[in-house]
Every structure is written in C-alpha cells, then in structure tokens.
Amino acid sequence: MLSEKQGEETMMSSLNETIELNEEREEEKGASPGSGFKNFLWHGGSVYDAWFSCASNQVAQVLLTLPYSFSQLGMISGIIFQVFYGLMGSWTAYLISILYVEYRSRKEKENVSFKNHVIQWFEVLEGLLGPYWKAIGLAFNCTFLLFGSVIQLIACASNIYYINDHLDKRTWTYIFGACCATTVFIPSFHNYRIWSFLGLGMTTYTAWYMTIAAIVHGQVENVVHSGPKKMVWYFTGATNILYTFGGHAVTVEIMHAMWKPQKFKAIYFFATLYVFTLTLPSAIAVYWAFGDQLLDHSNAFSLLPRNAWRDAGVILMLIHQFITFGFACTPLYFVWEKVIGMHDTKSIFLRALARLPVVIPIWFLAIIFPFFGPINSAVGALLVSFTVYVIPASAHMLTYRSASARQNAAEKLPKVIPSWTLMYVINAFVVIWVTIVGFGFGGWASMTNFIKQVDTFGLFAKCYQCPPKLPASNHTMHH
C-alpha cells in the first residue's frame, strides 16, 4: 500500500513541477518594466480568472430565453429543473477536471511537453480511452461549439433589433458576423481575463434589470400562467435549461489556461451558485409578469418596456455575446490550427489569419437557422446531452474501471463521496437520465418545435418573430 502511495506521489510531482515552472515564467513575464498593467489585463491563470470564465461563459444569451422556458414548463418545474441541471452540470464539469488531471499527470510522467500546445477534451479522451473516444469527443464537441457560436450570432441580431429596427435581423447577422470574426486575435483562454470580468458584470446588470423591470411593470391584464400545457413544450423548455448549464464544453481549455489546474475541481460549482442568483430571479419575475405571452416571445427583451435601462441591457448583452462567441469559438480555432499545423506558431497575426475559415460556416448557419430560442433546445438535446453529460460520465467510469486505475488515480475521491460504488451510481444515473429525458424526450420535443419554426418561417428567414410595422410609422408595434 505504501509503494502505491509513493508511486502516486511521484506521478503527481512531475505535473506540479511543470505547473510551478509555468507560473514562474508568467511571473517573470510580468516583472519586465512597463508590462505590469498589460499582464494584469491580458494574462489570467488564477483560480479567480477560471471562476470568472466559467460564470461568464455559462450564462449569456440563454438568460433571455429562460422566461420562455418557464412559460413552457410552469413556475415550479422551471425552478426544479434549473437547480437540478445546475448541480448535474457542476458534477460533470468536476469529472472533466479529474480526467484532465489524470491525463496530464500520465503524460508528464512520460516527459511529454505541452509548451505551445493547448490540451483539449478530445485529446484527454484519446490519451485515457483510445482513438474511438477521440473521434466521438471531437465530433460532439466541435459540432456543439460550432452551433454554440451560431446561437451567439443569432442572439446578437435578435437583441440589436429591439434598439434599431431599421435593418432586419438577417442584415444585423451579417454585421455582427464580421464583428465577431475579430475574436481570431485572442490567442487562448489565458488572455480572456478582462473580458470574463466585464462579461459577468454585463450579464449581472441584465439579469437584475430584467428582474426589477418585470416587478415594476407588474402583471399584464388578465395574465395567464397555464404551463405546463403540452408535452412538446414541457420537454423543449427542460432541454433549454439542460443547454443553459451545459457550458462546460470548454472546461479543459479553461483548466489548461490556469497556473494550477488541480485547483479547478470546485470552481464550476461555485460559478453555478452565482449563476443561480441571476437566472432564477429574472426568469421567475418575467414569467410572473407576462405569463403565457412568453410562448410567442422567446426573447424576454421583446416584452419589457422600451427605455434607457432596457437599451443599456441590450447593448451590454451584445458585447457579452461577442465575448461568449470567442469562448465557444476558441476551442474550434485550436482544433483547426492543429489540423493545418499552425498550432505552435507564435505569431498572433499568422494564427489569426489561419483561424478565419472557421468563422465562415458559423456566419452561414446563423443566416440559415435564425430561430432564437428553439435552436437552443435542439442543440441542448442533440449535442449538449452527450458532449458534457453522457460522455464525461461514461469516460470517467471506463477510465477507472480497473482496481489498479482506482488505486493509482491522480486525484482522490472527494470527501462527500465515500466510495467508488457511490461514484459509479451517480455517473450511471447521469448517463441514463440525460440519455432518456435529455436526448430522448428532449430531442423529440425540440426537433418537433424546430421543424415547426422552419415550416412557419422558412429557412433564411429575413426577420424571425419580428412584429409587423405600423403603417404610419417606422417603429415596431408594442406588445
């Protein structure tokens, strides 16, 4: 038993030494004259940076669609699903962090260097479980992040329309596609320090604006809260919440940007607790005020009264969507760089040029499927369910299936989980629940709703869910 413990300590020492060396290098970089302020804004590898990145990335445009989900689910189910999926998301993010540390400790033991190389989830799967798992991880992760980026573009166009309706949403998508393409200049998550901080501040403002504005507005006349009304709506709403707390597809990249990745384990959980303070009050207040009207208004901004406070919320969410686009797209940039052999290039401008082809299909898909709201649920059911719930839980069970793997695990079981049996029971529950409820029922409901949107509005819809113009005015009709 003593030799096993010594072996484990040896295994982890290499990882610790490498990480400490990286931290020293970062400190040396910051020591040069005149670079202190730049490093303060640009270089972020602390626990706090990771927390801001997780919280900022987790709740973006989906904040605006959660009241819509509540109208489909009803108040009680909406609250329960938020808490349930928030905790489940934190659990699977924890599993991903454990697998990352396991993979990295094994590779460091083999003297593998990760200088100028960002470890990604599919590489962790390949290192621990083989090439088939790499293919599965790569396919699901890239497709999810691709559509995650598409959703941010759609949200930009949907939001700006509520300030300036002189251009249709499709035209705004063209404009914001060009703006979001500038994220190619941000090298990695290590350089998102100031953006993550600002992004979370913007989301916090918008969430509390929605809450206060809905309460001040009060309930609309003859308000009706009929949810849950239809099974299709119920599972569509539940799957949008599954999508909300499935933002940990970039966990590995965020961990790799940290100076001490082992400290990540509980960060996502604490980020989720903060996110609850934004998502629950805003969704509850807006649904309380507008009720079933939300069934035809997937973007909460469309029902809130137009004033300077709302316009500020729209603008801040636009900036935050630009940041979240970068979060979703950066792992895709890394994959593309590795494919074309540019990943270890030090020049920011050369890498930016190489990354541009990634933005083109995202731009195109945002113009084809402009269905803000329904597309979230479809992506949640078909992609998020496997990418960040089923695959991590299954991978964890398979990685530690042998007694020797469990004994030599780089990370011990958490104190709240006294045995491996309980660990396996929780993981099996996650896999079964998400496969049946998230992918099965959620997939059926989301695709039914998505196809209905295509039939109603058509592909390449010029202005999805835009109210008709008043004949005598250029302003949109107030609801």
From Swiss-Prot:
Membrane topology field: Multi-pass membrane protein
Domain of life: Eukaryota
Location of the protein in the cell: Cell membrane
Extracellular side: 77-78, 156-171, 217-231, 287-313, 377, 443-479
GO terms assigned for molecular function: symporter activity
Inducing or repressing factors: Transient induction in roots by S.meliloti.
Biological process terms in GO annotation: amino acid transport; auxin-activated signaling pathway
Transmembrane segments annotated in the record for this chain: 59-76, 79-99, 135-155, 172-192, 196-216, 232-252, 266-286, 314-334, 356-376, 378-398, 422-442
Residues bearing attached sugar chains per UniProt: 474
Family designation: Belongs to the amino acid/polyamine transporter 2 family. Amino acid/auxin permease (AAAP) (TC 2.A.18.1) subfamily.
Name the UniProt record assigns to this protein: Auxin transporter-like protein 1
Taxon lineage: Eukaryota, Viridiplantae, Streptophyta, Embryophyta, Tracheophyta
Underlying gene: LAX1
